[in-house]
């Protein structure tokens, strides 16, 4: 669906460029925003657990997510649809291979970062990431930056991660892999403000206008699929699997609780993924996430307005019809 939405807005981009801060660069490209809105058309039900991230959608945050399949991105897009304007103010870090997919050009225009994996590219990619953040994050008024610290899909990295854990006397993980430090460290170094925080935007002890710019929170997201069977994009498009309820767990950490030193930050990241392992182990045994300490486990079913979904889908068909008419006109003019 991504190219159709980009195609719909393409004829108007010269006009939209006059209002870059509001439409194109500041709030995300119309094509990308609308393509995100089409995701619920192919996803199943999503149930949310843990902290309520709506409380921090006006603040800057780095979002850490476990990675099992390509469908994780679609799940996140759906979860964000009822979280206000933050869905239009996000930056994504994704594998460079996605640059060559149908939504690659949309992500490029949106200002997302494509990162190459492997030791041969690691140092160079971190330098490029730092420059990319300096160029695009502030200028396009981004709020959240999303990354997958494991550096790849679970099925591809599990064996290597377990061997590394055994060699370094680290916990044996089955449902996640040990995260990599590089990108997370660059993001924290580049985007941290000088003021420590501890209260979400709108809280009693802090007013938004008094806050300095900079990351305020780390949002730790754990995605779980029933029977540990993740959904990829092909499955959603072809629809050859029974409807699935995807579960998403949130934890919010004040940025002041995140250490800056590399060794301490590595330990902190490892602890987050060890906690993810415990969360997923509990989920696969019981079908539910355990409650946070001192709280009762409460799930929230994520729902969207059906009329809104119909409108978004209609826009997709409209874009196709519009380009059919445009191409047909030029064909008759030329031939």
Report residues per predicted region.
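Acidic, Ser/Thr-rich peripheral helices and adjacent loops at domain boundaries
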Residues: 169, 236-244
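A transmembrane-helix-recognition feature enriched in membrane-embedded lipid enzymes
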Residues: 1-46, 311-333
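Soluble catalytic domains of membrane acyltransferases
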Residues: 38-231
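ATP/nucleoside-binding phosphotransfer catalytic cores, i.e., glycine-rich phosphate-binding loops
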Residues: 254-256, 260-264
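A short pocket-lining beta-strand/turn micro-motif at the edge of beta-sheets
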Residues: 214-217, 244-248
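Juxtamembrane amphipathic/hinge helix adjacent to a transmembrane helix
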Residues: 263-303
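Juxtamembrane cytosolic/matrix-side boundary and N-terminal portion
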Residues: 297-315
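Short amphipathic
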Residues: 49-50, 245-256
């Amino acid at each position: 669906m991504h190219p159709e939405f980009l195609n719909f807005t393409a004829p108007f981009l010269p006009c939209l460029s006059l209002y870059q801060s509001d439409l194109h660069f500041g709030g995300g490209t119309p094509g990308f925003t609308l393509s995100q809105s089409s995701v619920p058309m192919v996803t199943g039900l999503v149930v949310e657990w843990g902290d309520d991230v709506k409380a921090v959608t006006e603040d800057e945050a780095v979002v850490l997510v476990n990675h099992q399949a390509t469908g994780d991105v679609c799940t996140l897009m759906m979860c964000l649809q009822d979280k206000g304007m933050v869905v239009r103010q996000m930056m994504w870090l994704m594998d460079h291979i996605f640059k060559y997919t149908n939504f690659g050009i949309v992500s490029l225009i949106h200002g997302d970062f494509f990162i190459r994996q492997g030791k041969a590219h690691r140092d160079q990619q971190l330098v490029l990431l730092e420059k990319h953040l300096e160029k695009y994050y502030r200028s396009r008024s981004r709020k959240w930056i999303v990354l997958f610290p494991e550096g790849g899909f679970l099925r591809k990295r599990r064996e290597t991660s377990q061997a590394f854990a055994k060699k370094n006397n680290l916990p044996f993980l089955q449902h996640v892999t040990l995260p990599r430090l590089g990108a997370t460290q660059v993001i924290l170094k580049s985007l941290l403000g000088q003021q420590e925080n501890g209260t979400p935007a709108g809280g009693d002890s802090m007013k938004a206008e008094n806050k300095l710019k900079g990351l305020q929170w780390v949002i730790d997201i754990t995605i779980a699929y029933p029977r540990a069977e993740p959904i990829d994009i092909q499955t959603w498009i072809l629809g050859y699997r029974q409807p699935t309820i995807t579960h998403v767990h949130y934890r919010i950490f004040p940025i002041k609780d995140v250490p800056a030193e590399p060794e301490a930050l590595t330990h902190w990241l490892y602890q987050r993924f060890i906690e993810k392992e415990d969360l997923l182990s509990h989920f696969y045994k019981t079908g539910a996430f355990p409650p946070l300490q001192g709280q009762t486990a409460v799930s929230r079913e994520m729902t969207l307005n059906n009329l809104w979904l119909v409108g978004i889908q209609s826009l997709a068909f409209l874009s196709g019809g519009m380009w059919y008419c445009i191409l047909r006109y030029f064909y008759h003019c030329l031939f």
